[in-house]
């Protein structure tokens, strides 16, 4: 007897049972998985998952398939179709697309649905054309020292943008702190300890949709300050340099002069969404100061880049940034300068120290 005949014999004698195939589509399992995720991950992470699903999965042939009928070939076909069909998919975006397929099918297996196979995800990654993924076309550069000094002078001393003085002072102070914009927006005077010369980071401003019991959005996006941070490593204390203390003193003088009772450092007389207000303020501030525009996140990256250039160990930089590992810091936060010719030339002179004399190197000139 061959294997098939043995199996048929086992089935007919009741020794081998055939699992009942359950007719559940990928879309149905995704909904169950998404409802489960709402209770275990942050709301803004759920929003990102939903956006990715709606863009690449919703309405596709893939989500209409019964999960019991899906195999590696189907997953490869779908993911390849996304990469090739959409074009210009970055590695970061693809990781979000892949995460949904992987997590939903693993979840279906966890539910012990009849007929759902155990997928070989390593094989799937091998056959998906990840070589066609593109690098992020936008490249950040560190803010030049001259631009930073110009911004500091025009904000702190000249009050270039008086209507948004609090926001402007917070933005330029962040060159000494390296905070995420949500952390900067949520800073209050209770977080500032001028006696010990530290700022304590333990909360952030978030944005996310409220959802009902079915996982559907309820109303507009909600902005809120939460006693939480991105990761457990983000709870930290940042030492204050004398320059940062000076800016804080200027900020306190401004709040006292205006009679502000609000505790937020970036408060400018109106209860606005502070993250959005800081973003808009920076755009105008760059224009008023005649410097090339950069984002609030580039301030954070410039902070890390300048500390790295000073010789600070990456472990310490990661601690100040609130990163869980040094790889994140080194891979994503150490930038180049747009105009770095002289710096590169200096390092090349120092490192490539073999010289020519009349067409010969120093070493060969001494050979006999």
Regions of interest found by a model, annotated:
Residues 104, 145-149, 239-291:
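Active-site/catalytic core of tyrosine-dependent DNA strand-transfer enzymes
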Residues 142, 205-207, 321-347:
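Catalytic-site neighborhood detector that most strongly recognizes the C-terminal catalytic loop/helix
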